[in-house]
Amino acid sequence: IVEAGTPSPWISRLFDEIGHKEIVANPRKLGAIYKSDNKTDERDAEMLARIGRFDPKLLHAIQHSSLKHQRDRKVVDAREALVGVRTKLINYVRSSLKSFGIFLPKGTSAATFAKITKEHLSDKDYLLFESAIQTIAELSERIKEAEKDIDALIEQDYPEALRLQAVAGVG
């Protein structure tokens, strides 16, 4: 019995490869685990074992995605992480500039933020934020590359996603 978590897909595949039957328990469906006030790995493992021995159905077993699907999902996750980092940097620069009384035009897109920011700052002010602004520009390029990778992946392996992208506001 394995508790679902970050390493559980790998552990599940490893058990399959060596011929062991595993149950990947969904801890969110097990109040005895996620509602516990005195959580430890040892107590959780013991509780999973006891429940599994009593009635495995109570573990609400999950089935992990295939390794291919897991890898494909990481392409999307990487893009999401890049967007998150870029957003934090943009918010940092915007709020810092406001403290100097500098306000960027409304509607400045994340993709053009670096260019527009450079156009609206004096050389002296630009130097204060140069590394952040250049990083934002580089992140925007990396995000474009990630989007191309995702589009290629969709076209090659997930054509059903193209239909979702055809609906305005979706995908």
How should each PLM-predicted stretch be described?
Residues 1-171:
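A detector of single, family-specific signature residues
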